[in-house]
Design a protein with these regions (language model features):
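Conserved SAM/SAH-binding beta-strand->alpha-helix loop
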Residues: 116-118
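Conserved beta-strand signature within the Rossmann-like core of class I S-adenosyl-L-methionine
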Residues: 169-181
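N-terminal auxiliary segments of SAM/dcSAM-dependent transferases
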Residues: 1-50
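Conserved class I S-adenosyl-L-methionine
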Residues: 85-95
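Conserved Class I S-adenosyl-L-methionine
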Residues: 3-4, 216-274
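Conserved SAM-binding loop of SAM-dependent methyltransferases across substrates and taxa
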Residues: 96-107
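Conserved SAM-binding strand-loop segment of SAM-dependent methyltransferases
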Residues: 128-140
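Class I SAM-dependent methyltransferase Rossmann-like catalytic core
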Residues: 47, 52-72
Length: 274
């Protein structure tokens, strides 16, 4: 029997791994799928049959990230976790696991959760040392005060749930597009380009979390045609741009563009200090 920090989504008790099934004391059970993940997204929490990213966008993102274009961001997050000496980490919105798999190598236990089953299925093939979970931010699948760090990279930030699962001195790492992220690509797709507004997250989180550090990672990229197509397909831009502008951009042999990432490190505020 293996004990970790997973929580039953029905009764909220700790799950124990017996053979290849996660079970709680109330008798609820969740089998590990043949791909190596567990589905803790119970029916009553679902709003659609296949929530999350489409298989097409998941495949495009996996192909793009495997090209190493966002490796500077991946390594920056890993270094941050090492500096924090984190042991228990929950990656919220893990997708196909590119960042989560790297995180696992510097912590004791790493849990990756995503609402998109097709993404988690792909992630589970990447690294069997990560505990991969299909679940939702509305009910994070871990027990109270069990995590040293939660991470949200380009993903939702369920504040109340993050507060619940972090220990008293726990940290939250948020990664979001910096002001001019992929400006050249957006300029080609849209007549008007609005700058990203990463500062809004600091304002949204300030009551519950204290900002400890922030940094911007810039990664100048030269994309060939296939990488460019993958980059467009893996983001919401694919659906918001006009078909004509998208086609025109996808026909380019190369595109020079700078990826710019805003990294925020927050710490859970001490209730006694508020």
């Amino acid at each position: 029997m293996t004990t970790q920090n997973l929580m039953c989504p029905v009764c909220r008790q700790r799950l124990e791994l017996v053979s290849k099934t996660w079970r709680c004391e109330q008798g609820h059970s969740y089998d590990i799928a043949k791909q190596g993940y567990v589905n803790l997204h119970v029916v009553q929490h679902k709003h659609s049959k296949n929530p999350g990213d489409t298989p097409e966008s998941v495949d495009a993102r996996r192909a793009f990230l495997q090209g190493g274009y966002y490796q500077p961001l991946q390594q920056a997050v890993v270094h941050l976790l090492k500096d924090l000496k984190a042991k228990m980490v929950l990656d919220i919105g893990c997708g196909e696991g590119y960042y989560t798999s790297a995180m696992q190598q510097v912590v004791e236990q790493c849990i990756g959760v995503d609402i998109a089953k097709n993404a988690v299925q792909r992630a589970a093939k990447l690294n069997d040392k990560v505990t991969w979970v299909v679940g939702t931010g509305a009910t994070l699948p871990v027990i109270d005060q069990s995590m040293d760090v939660c991470t949200s990279l380009f993903s939702p930030i369920p504040q109340t749930e993050i507060l619940r699962v972090l220990n008293d001195d726990g940290y939250l790492i948020v990664v979001t597009p910096a002001t001019d992220h992929l400006y050249a690509k957006r300029e080609a797709l849209f007549e008007q380009v609005n700058p990203h507004t990463p500062q809004k997250f600091v304002e949204q989180l300030q009551d519950l979390f204290e900002l400890k550090e922030q940094q911007v990672i810039d990664a100048p990229l030269v994309l060939d045609q296939q990488a460019l197509k993958n980059l467009i397909a893996m983001t919401p831009y694919a659906y918001k741009a006009s078909p004509e502008r998208r086609m025109q951009l996808e026909q380019k042999a190369h595109l020079q563009v700078t990826a710019s990432f805003q990294i925020y490190l927050f710490q859970k505020r001490n209730k006694k200090a508020i």
